[in-house]
A protein has these predicted regions:
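Structural core segment of the AMP-binding/adenylate-forming
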Residues: 12, 49, 81-159, 542
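Conserved ATP-binding/catalytic segment of the ANL
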Residues: 54, 189, 403-471, 488
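Conserved ATP-dependent adenylate/AMP-binding module captured primarily in the ANL superfamily
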Residues: 93-123, 209-226, 257-271, 343
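Conserved C-terminal "lid"/linker of ANL adenylate-forming enzymes
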Residues: 494-496, 544-638
Length: 639
């Protein structure tokens, strides 16, 4: 076999070198089912040859939709073996979003998890002229579906075994024909300002970035990774397909999104990649359990927690940890930290990464203090998910880590972060103009993020460059920076801040229904719905105090002066967020224009009318009068 320049060649290598070692598991009906690298290859070979028998050709695109399942990963690899590219999509996307991606990418084959996903495709079939084949994984409920272009995964594999009898060397020949600059993935960006763009990632992008990550983190075949992120997320593709193939470690698919936390505890992986919300939810669970504990246990927990966090702050500042604190830390490992890690499923984790948005300093320090090697990572789809990473011993809640070896980072004149390296993508599918806007003549990718390099050589991200502005009083205004400060509160799920060319900063806030609901129940405050809870005077008071805490960490001129609690969460289905939960600012500003006018018009309440979209596409309107609150009640002026 020639050089390992494509992912399929890595698969052949793994089947040869690690044939009997577990490659992937899935939990089905409470039981973990394991597949070795040899079995992984056999399934990929059979499915790839089945696709070939059905007309799949080099350059074709295959899409997958559903939860994390081995057969959906095998399908992506099978397409790549034949010289095609995989196009993963978000399974909770609306029909019009799916149709856009599948048509834009010229998808000819879709592999769906189950009946629910097949039904979505059936509803769109007339809108998908390029579609030739739909394959389903789970046969439950599919018995009476009769279409020539619809087949089960098992049926396609059976076709592949028959095809192999007359084309015995075609699979290996197809892999051998693959080149490093062939497309491996088309990952669609979140589309904060318009339709999502298809970022084209090659095998070279994937493998060279894996080499960089592997040199830093020393991934090994014995590692275990839990695959629960949406398959359309570049982080999932990079870990479950690229890094797993590169390093040979095992990927584990949970039973369902609802069982992830339970499966995490049961599995105890050694590697974990999680967005801030996951870490915040785990910390909240620990805090709630601590609140319900007997007084003695609660005091013991708080004593050791404070000791661990003090030690972590000293360590992060490069200061020595006193002997007494070290001894208390050692005792805490036995009585508190170890049991907490075990309860969360983190006892065996040796590398834990968080990215996509800043993680609150208190949350970051908590996990570091209980012995979790939690570090920040920064990247985006267009650079194959990796730009900078915090090395061991340099973890810090305020930075995105050092630029990785082999990846160059430069700060442009206006503060934009520029990136050059082997992970920089090939371009946007069918959009040369957009590609030229972000990749300059010298090969630098213009990230669109504003940031700087701190005195220690770490990258610090402030906000999206296009969102940065100034207030009418000349104060720098970075909405995401302000929003993240407030979202460090466990009671606040989403924030949208306004203030560009305005006299002061205001914010629309969506509460976290779980933590605020628990807070209300402990205080005997009854509520019937999200809307009812969000408008309780007590809840407005709670959020006011949380904003005050956040304001203490902000410059005087950018502190939030007025706020409003939304009567519903911000949702991707309502076009307020992307599927990766990034605010679509332009749309939100237009939708909530009357609210913004009320903020700056000095009004104390506003008529809030919002449309909500259900999973089946139906829409309904919510209307209510909502109070606008001043953060400081004694504030007499609005300007």
């Amino acid at each position: 076999m020639s050089e390992l320049v494509t992912l399929p060649r890595l698969l052949l290598r793994n089947a040869k070198d690690f044939g009997r070692r577990t490659a992937i598991r899935e939990k089905d009906r409470g039981i973990w089912q394991s597949y070795t690298w040899a079995e992984y290859l056999a399934h990929v070979r059979d499915f790839a040859l089945g696709l070939a028998a059905l007309g799949f050709e080099r350059g074709d695109r295959l899409s997958v939709i559903g939860d994390n399942r081995p057969r959906l990963y095998w399908a992506q690899m099978a397409a790549q073996c034949l010289g095609g590219a995989s196009v993963p999509v978000y399974q909770d996307s609306l029909g019009k979003e799916l149709a856009y991606v599948w048509n834009h990418a010229d998808v000819a084959t879709i592999v769906a998890e189950d009946q629910e996903q097949v039904d979505k495709i059936l509803a769109l079939r007339d809108q998908l002229p390029m579609l030739r084949l739909v394959v389903y994984d789970d046969p439950r409920g599919m018995l009476h579906y009769r279409h020539d272009w619809l087949k089960s995964f098992a049926d396609v594999e059976a076709l592949g075994r028959e095809f192999a009898k007359t084309h015995p060397d075609s699979f290996e020949a197809a892999i051998e024909a693959g080149k490093a600059d062939d497309l491996a993935f088309i990952c669609y960006t979140s589309g904060t300002t318009g339709s999502p763009k298809g970022a084209m990632l090659t095998h070279a992008n994937a493998i060279e970035t894996a080499k960089i990550a592997g040199a830093i983190e020393k991934y090994r075949p014995e590692d275990e990774y839990l695959a629960y992120l949406p398959m359309a997320c570049v982080g999932d593709a990079f870990y479950t397909l690229v890094l797993s193939l590169y390093a040979g470690f095992a990927v584990n698919c949970p039973e369902s999104p609802e069982t992830v936390q339970r499966d995490l505890r049961e599995l105890g992986p050694t590697l974990l990649l999680a967005p801030p919300r996951i870490w915040e939810n785990m910390l909240t669970a620990v805090q709630v359990k601590g609140t319900d504990a007997p007084p003695l246990k609660r005091r013991v927990f708080e004593t050791f927690r404070r000791a661990a966090e003090q030690a972590e702050i000293l360590r992060a500042d490069g200061k020595p940890v006193p002997l007494g604190l070290r001894m208390l830390r050692a005792l805490g490992e036995f009585f508190v930290y170890g049991p907490v890690r075990d309860q969360l499923g983190l006892r065996r984790v040796r590398t834990a990464l968080t990215g996509g948005a800043p993680l609150g300093p208190d949350t970051f320090r908590f996990f570091r203090s209980i012995g979790v090697n939690l570090k920040q990572v920064y990247g985006c789809t267009e650079v194959t998910g990796l730009t900078s990473l915090q090395p061991d011993g340099e973890a810090n809640p305020t930075t995105a880590g050092r630029p990785c070896p082999g990846i160059e980072v430069r700060i442009a004149e206006r503060g934009e972060v520029l990136v050059k390296g082997p992970g920089v993508f090939k371009g946007y599918l069918k959009d040369d103009a957009a590609t030229q806007e972000v990749i300059d003549a010298h090969g630098w990718f213009h990230s669109g993020d504003a940031g700087f390099i701190d005195p220690h050589g770490h990258l610090v991200i402030i906000d999206r460059a296009k969102d940065c502005g100034v207030t009418s009083r000349g104060e720098p205004f970075a909405p995401q920076f302000i929003e993240n400060k407030l979202k460090f509160s466990p009671y606040i799920r989403e924030v949208v801040a306004f203030g560009h060319e305005r006299p002061f900063v205001v914010a629309m806030i969506a509460i976290d229904i779980n933590t605020v609901g628990s807070w209300a129940e402990r205080r005997g405050i009854p509520y019937t719905s999200y809307m009812d809870l969000s408008q309780k005077p007590e809840v407005r008071g709670l959020i006011r105090e949380e904003i005050r805490k956040g304001n203490e960490t902000l410059p005087e001129g950018t502190r939030v002066r007025r706020f409003l609690l939304l009567t519903k969460d911000l949702e991707a289905d309502d076009a307020e967020m992307t599927r990766t939960r990034k605010v679509r600012r332009r749309f939100v500003a237009e939708k909530y224009a009357p609210v913004i006018d009320a903020f700056y018009g000095g009004r104390d309440e506003v008529e809030l009318s919002t449309e909500i979209t259900y999973e089946d596409g139906r829409q309904a309107a919510l209307k209510s009068r909502v109070r606008i609150e001043d953060v400081e009640e004694e504030m007499a002026t609005r300007g």
